[in-house]
């Protein structure tokens, strides 16, 4: 086919594929969401960016889920010391209002094409997106995501020491994965129906946590308490 899938952080595999000279573009999610909160390392990302540059391949960062402050920086790739050619954005850009965008490096010369766009530049969507940026700045939500993410991850790792069902805690900012030695459904159903706490999931054993960027310490503590109650009952 025309698409090749390669393992995250296996730089040698990516370099081998890129050095064939027929790769148009590379798309990576710097923190994989549905992929299980797997994180690209700086060494991998920088090596990949260099390989793309060497081979004339476009580097695309998918920031739809991990961008817009979610990781504790505005974009997740900023943790990795790279500058992609294209950045895809959605979800957080409109805080629930349907909108998406594509950020393009100034290295690409803009030209007029034949096609237009049906919903592009929608005034209501753009107004919502501008309001989101205002609130993020006024309420320091990116910094709050970093601080509260650090706190939540630390508390979850502390909980791991007394809860053998937790096998791993990983993530950055408010994009966190908690892995169990039991199916995530065993934990998630109790959280939803008994503790009234909604979470995401990935794979078969991972609880995926993406709380609002405005989460408070009290709310984080409340979640830890509810999760502890559920785990104690397993």
Language-model regions, residue ranges each:
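Conserved N-terminal phosphate-binding loop of PLP-dependent enzymes in the Aspartate aminotransferase
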Residues: 1-234
């Amino acid at each position: 086919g025309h698409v090749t899938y390669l393992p995250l952080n296996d730089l040698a595999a990516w370099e081998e594929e890129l050095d064939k000279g027929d790769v148009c573009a590379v798309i990576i999610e710097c923190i994989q969401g549905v992929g299980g909160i797997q994180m690209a390392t700086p060494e991998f990302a920088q090596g990949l960016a260099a390989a793309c540059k060497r081979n004339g391949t476009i580097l695309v960062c998918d920031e739809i889920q991990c961008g817009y402050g979610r990781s504790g920086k505005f974009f997740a790739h900023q943790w990795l010391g790279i500058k992609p050619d294209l950045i895809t954005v959605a979800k957080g850009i409109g805080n629930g209002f349907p909108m998406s965008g594509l950020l393009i490096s100034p290295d690409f010369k803009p030209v007029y094409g034949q096609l237009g766009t049906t919903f592009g530049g929608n005034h209501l969507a753009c107004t919502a997106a501008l309001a989101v940026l205002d609130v993020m700045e006024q309420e320091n939500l990116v910094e709050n995501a970093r601080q509260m993410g650090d706190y939540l991850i630390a508390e979850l790792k502390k909980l791991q020491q007394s809860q053998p069902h937790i096998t791993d805690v990983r993530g950055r900012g408010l994009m966190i994965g908690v892995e169990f030695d039991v199916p995530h459904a065993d934990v998630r159903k109790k959280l939803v129906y008994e503790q009234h706490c909604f979470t995401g999931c990935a794979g078969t054993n991972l609880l995926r946590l993406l709380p609002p960027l405005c989460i408070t310490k009290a709310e984080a503590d409340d979640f830890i308490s509810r999760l502890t109650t559920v785990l104690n009952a397993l």
